[in-house]
UniProtKB/Swiss-Prot annotation:
The keyword Cytoplasm does not apply. Residues 277-310 bind DNA. The lineage of its organism: Bacteria, Bacillati, Actinomycetota, Actinomycetes, Mycobacteriales. Keywords: Cell cycle, Cell division, DNA-binding. This is Probable cell division protein WhiA. Gene3D superfamilies: Homing endonucleases. GO terms for biological process: cell division; regulation of sporulation. The keyword Cell cycle applies. InterPro entries: Homing_endonucl (IPR027434), Sporu_reg_WhiA_N_dom (IPR018478), Sporulation_regulator_WhiA (IPR003802), Sporulation_regulator_WhiA_C (IPR023054), WhiA_LAGLIDADG_dom (IPR039518). The gene is whiA. Residues 304-327 are annotated as: Disordered. Belongs to the WhiA family. GO terms for molecular function: DNA binding. It comes from Mycolicibacterium vanbaalenii (strain DSM 7251 / JCM 13017 / BCRC 16820 / KCTC 9966 / NRRL B-24157 / PYR-1) (Mycobacterium vanbaalenii). Involved in cell division and chromosome segregation.
């Protein structure tokens, strides 16, 4: 099951005891999923949702809280409609429901944001407002670089009201207009987790957090692997360059090279990929890596001085781009 469906399924099964919170959820769900229509001179309230369990929850709450009967119509997937949709409709008592839920103000005008009783309600009402909005038009993407919890809004006023509700819950949300559509987006991973818990989707939050942690562990492992690969490549190139310089140094000095420096140089040439510590163990008698490094350093310095005196290419000339490319 996709993350969005998991959240909606869990929220639809959540038991809410507070009447005020249940009313806030219904008002928000109707505001974000529906609209008011005039049919034969009467106000009809409709809400279109994507899961049958959401439609049944809304129908039950409308009856329990307001005493009105709602009818659920099933719109099967066909044509441009990719999935089955469910329309909850209150026709006979539509105007009364619209007034009681705050979709119409005292003068009978449609409310553009969220109802005043929801905006000025308790923290529990703010949580319920988010729950209703998410059930109506929410989405949650998988954890990742572009993860987000998002709600499509019927207008900028509703979006700003939802941002304000999130602020009351200690969550930073942003209202944005994308391709002419108003949306409220939460991108921070910690904020997404906190909001899921606030809405009542704790189980889904745990699943989401687990996937998020697994992804972060994989990303960290990949970064470390890339880092290790880069280090290995640098080490290999450095070893090849050092061996090439030592080889050139032995050519420049010829028979004049001191035996102990020649021994260290020949070890470097013979074991191009070995570390200084490994070269020290291969020496006879064994020596420390610092001793090996010191002898090779003196060998190169001596050869470069002689090359300068004789006017010939020094040890650096042996390190060509082609040589490093092949390393």
């Amino acid at each position: 099951m996709a993350m969005t469906a998991e959240v909606k399924d869990e929220l639809s099964r959540l038991v809410v005891n507070s009447v005020s919170a249940r009313r806030a959820e219904v008002a928000s769900l109707l505001r974000f999923a529906g609209g008011l229509h005039i049919v034969s001179g009467r106000v009809v309230v409709e809400a279109e949702v994507d899961l049958g369990i959401i439609a049944r929850r809304l129908r039950k709450d409308i009856y329990d809280l307001y005493g009105y009967n709602a009818v659920v119509h099933v719109l099967s997937a066909s044509g441009i409609r990719k999935s089955t949709r469910y329309v909850v409709r209150v026709a006979k008592d539509g105007e009364a429901l619209a007034r009681q839920t705050g979709l119409l103000d005292l003068r009978g005008r449609p409310v553009r944001g969220l109802p005043a009783q929801v905006v000025g309600g308790s923290v529990g009402d703010a949580e319920a407002a988010w729950r209703g909005a998410f059930l109506a038009h929410g989405s949650l993407t998988e954890p990742g670089r572009s993860s987000a919890l998002e709600v499509s809004c019927p207008g900028p006023e509703a979006a700003l009201a939802l941002v304000g509700a999130a602020r009351r819950l200690g969550v930073s949300a942003k209202a944005r207009e994308v391709r002419g559509s108003d949306r409220v987006v939460v991108r921070d991973g910690e904020a997404i987790g906190a909001l899921l818990t606030r809405m009542g989707a704790q189980d889904t939050r745990l699943t989401w957090e687990e996937r998020r942690m697994r992804r972060e562990v994989r990303a960290t492992a990949n970064r470390l692997a890339n880092f290790d690969d880069a280090n290995l490549r640098r080490s290999a190139r450095a070893a090849v360059a050092a061996a090439a310089r030592v080889e050139r140094a032995l050519q420049i000095l010829g028979d004049t090279v001191p035996d102990h420096l020649a021994a260290a140089g020949n070890l470097r040439v013979a074991h191009r990929q070995a570390s200084l510590e490994e070269l020290g163990r291969l020496a006879d008698p064994p020596m420390t890596k610092d001793a090996v490094a010191g002898r090779i350093r003196r060998l190169l310095s001596m050869a470069d001085r002689k090359a300068k005196q004789d006017g010939i290419p020094d040890t650096e000339s042996a390190v060509t781009p082609d040589l490093l490319e092949d390393a």
